[in-house]
Amino acid sequence: MQFAYRIDTSAVNPLRNLPTSVATDAPASLPLRNLIRGLHLGLPSGQSVAKAMGVKVLHDDEILLGKFVEHIPVGEEPIPIVRAAGKVFAHNCPLWTYILAETRQYTEDVKIPVTEGLTIKTPRLGPVGGRIVAEVFLGLMFGDKHSLLNQDPLWTPALGAKYTLKDFVAYALGK
């Protein structure tokens, strides 16, 4: 079984240095390309979006860059964004980085299916990232005339009010 990388504010090597066949112009770093794109699109800061949503706004010292693992090697500890990237990001964290940093605050113990009784603490999307993803899915479903939301607008999940994406995937897989 191939597990995905955890959500965090670090970038794996293949994304830090994209091949020239993918990134024909500089920079070759996907994270840097995303940050520049967000700047050019005029995306609001993560803190601005959290405030507009009425959810907890992360403080600068809670927005950490680095790997989010249980056993952090010495010298690889995550560091606050302002210390890593400068005061320009004080109360002004790029939205993409904010969403990734938010996952450090929201973790869940998950059982590893291939090992008996072993669980890991895994990050999950927080209020800002989770809501953006949910609204994109809902927008796609409302935009699809064959979607259940358009076919039967009064439909509600049989599982009740607490129906998660995990439940939806399990249902789709027949579990």
Predicted regions mapped to residue ranges:
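Terminal regions of secretory-pathway proteins
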Residues: M1-K175
